Amino acid sequence: MEKLNTDIIVFLINLDRATKRLSEMEDRLSNIGIDYIRISAIDGKFYKYSEKEYCEKLYKRCCGKKTSSGEIGCYLSHYKSIEYFIKSGKEYALILEDDAVFNSDFVKILNKLVSISYFWDFVKFNTARDGGFGNIAVKGLFNGYKLYASLFPKTFSAAYLINTKAAKSLYAKLLPMYVPFDHEMIKFWKYDIRQYSIFPSPVSIESKDSFIGTYGKESLKFPFYKRISVLFYRIFTQIVRSINFYKLLKSPNKRKG
């Protein structure tokens, strides 16, 4: 079994009440030889957030729905994990939610990514499609795995690899929250980072719902006529992404991750 590069620290986000989830993840990670640090997830059901952490006005405008306590908990749990990473002094962090499932190549892929760390700042798993409009392979890895730049990315936050540059930029700019974390994290231009996805995906999602981010989904969307602002926000975000997309296609100067 290939060992994980020691420059990578692994964080697993898990709610205190999700003990079965933790046990299942322990087995999955043990099977591929990965040790981890558990991050006690912020439970949005009970957490009292501040205005510095969450902007309700912008959330309603950009998401078109009432506040979701689960989404707030998820967002702040990832923020907490990034803070722990920065304090760790490590070069890279793999951040996981407790519903991620890994294939047998996962550790080898992580080690390969470290060996080409000059190329990326943030790598998402299970978010790219092979070919198709807007999905461009920018670098081969091994056995058909490739890094992709995606003009129209899938939102996904269950597994991603970041370096210290990305972590510090995210930590400085993530708050206050006004969209779910998996929607915010794709804004590579805002954080000045090189962000890619991998195909074929080495990570999938367990079919059962994760506790992380799901609590509060009973919050209903507003009627259509109150959601027009959501359309404008999404169009604007895609335009900005399209304008900056070329940056992901340029070959970077070699640098240490």
List the predicted regions and their residue ranges:
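An acidic/histidine-cluster motif and surrounding catalytic segment
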Residues: 1-96, 100-257
